[in-house]
């Protein structure tokens, strides 16, 4: 993805040396911040993976959140490696693994967007048709959907790496254009569906004829979707636009494009803290409890008065 690599090799005339120097300084500062922040998000996601994978009984939504944590970890890992190589000025080494880092980054982003959309849809279904959802929903739906989304999310970046790679001399203009159109269309579909079901869910909870009790799971999902709509979708939109306008990329990168990438990186780190915040607050106050109990409460699908929880 040219989105974060043009500053590595771009040069400019002397008359623009000052603006370019400022741009490079900003770029390096953002990478230093990424090296500092990304490991925090990676550790938080590892904690989520450990407890949801081995310590807590899974349900439909915990399976999705588990896979979402994997995608967030992959994104942060790829991004932190890129930032480390830039800060250490290992540009030669980065030249050879750039395509792999870009593939992992977009793979993780597309999967994260896809799984968040599915979570929003299922949350909407569970509220609008609770009896059908809890009684008739196939048992292994979550596992099947996750496998399909992993495969589909890997397909587009893998095809781009195969057909659009200059490094491996496999660039095919016609195929590359088709792949970009299809992947861009898929992202647009995800954007529209996510926004639509999020709006339906909000209206159903706040304006429905019957009062629907809000659960911690609803709050957790709502916060994640809100942050994705604010910080995640701009990253995807810019990626789509960038695929069709790379001639003046240096100017755009120096302006705001890499800011979008790093803001989304920070957003992923914040996402991991949502579970701990939602799970640890009770009656407007933070409660002292184990991490396992905090995560259990964060994905609790029943209201507190009906869930039988015995927090301190």
Curated annotation (Swiss-Prot):
Spans traversing the lipid bilayer: 32-52, 68-88, 107-127, 141-161, 181-201, 221-241, 260-280
- Localization per Swiss-Prot or TrEMBL: Membrane
Q: Which InterPro entries match?
A: GPCR_Rhodpsn_7TM, MRGPCRFAMILY
Annotated membrane topology is: Multi-pass membrane protein
**Entry keyword Nucleotide-binding:** no
Query: Which key words are in the record?
Result: G-protein coupled receptor, Membrane, Receptor, Transducer, Transmembrane, Transmembrane helix
Report the PROSITE patterns cross-referenced here: G_PROTEIN_RECEP_F1_2
State the source organism's domain of life. Answer: Eukaryota
Q: Which GO terms describe its cellular component?
A: membrane
Cytoplasmic topological domain: 53-67, 128-140, 202-220, 281-312
Q: What does this protein do?
A: Orphan receptor. Probably involved in the function of nociceptive neurons. May regulate nociceptor function and/or development, including the sensation or modulation of pain.
Alphabetical list of PANTHER family matching this protein: MAS-RELATED G-PROTEIN COUPLED RECEPTOR, MAS-RELATED G-PROTEIN COUPLED RECEPTOR MEMBER B3
Q: What is this protein called?
A: Mas-related G-protein coupled receptor member B3
């Amino acid at each position: 993805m040219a989105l974060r690599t043009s500053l590595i090799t771009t040069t400019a005339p002397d008359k623009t040396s000052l603006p370019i120097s400022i741009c490079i300084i900003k770029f390096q500062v953002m990478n230093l911040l990424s090296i500092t922040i990304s490991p925090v998000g990676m550790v938080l996601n590892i904690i989520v993976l450990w407890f949801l994978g081995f310590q807590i009984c899974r349900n439909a939504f915990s399976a999705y959140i588990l896979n979402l944590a994997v995608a967030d970890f992959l994104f942060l890992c790829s991004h932190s490696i890129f930032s480390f190589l830039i800060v250490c000025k290992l540009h030669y080494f980065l030249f050879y693994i750039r395509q792999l880092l870009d593939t992992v980054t977009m793979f993780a982003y597309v999967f994260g967007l896809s799984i968040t959309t599915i979570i929003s849809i299922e949350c909407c279904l569970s509220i609008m048709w609770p009896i059908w959802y809890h009684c008739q929903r196939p048992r292994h739906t979550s596992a099947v959907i996750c496998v399909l989304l992993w495969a589909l999310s890997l397909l587009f970046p893998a095809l781009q790496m195969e057909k659009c790679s200059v490094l491996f001399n496999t660039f095919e203009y016609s195929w590359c254009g088709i792949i970009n159109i299809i992947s861009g269309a898929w992202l647009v579909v995800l954007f529209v569906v996510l926004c639509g079901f999020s709006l339906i869910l909000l209206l159903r909870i706040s304006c429905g004829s019957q009062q629907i009790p809000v659960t911690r799971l609803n709050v957790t999902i709502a916060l994640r979707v809100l942050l994705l709509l604010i910080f995640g979708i701009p990253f995807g939109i810019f990626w789509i636009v960038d695929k069709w306008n790379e001639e003046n990329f240096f100017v755009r990168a120096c302006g705001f494009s890499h800011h979008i990438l790093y803001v989304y990186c920070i957003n992923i780190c914040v996402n991991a803290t949502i579970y701990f915040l939602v799970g640890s607050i009770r009656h407007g106050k933070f409660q002292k409890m184990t991490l396992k109990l905090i995560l259990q409460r964060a994905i609790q699908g029943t209201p507190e008065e009906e869930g039988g929880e015995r927090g301190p």
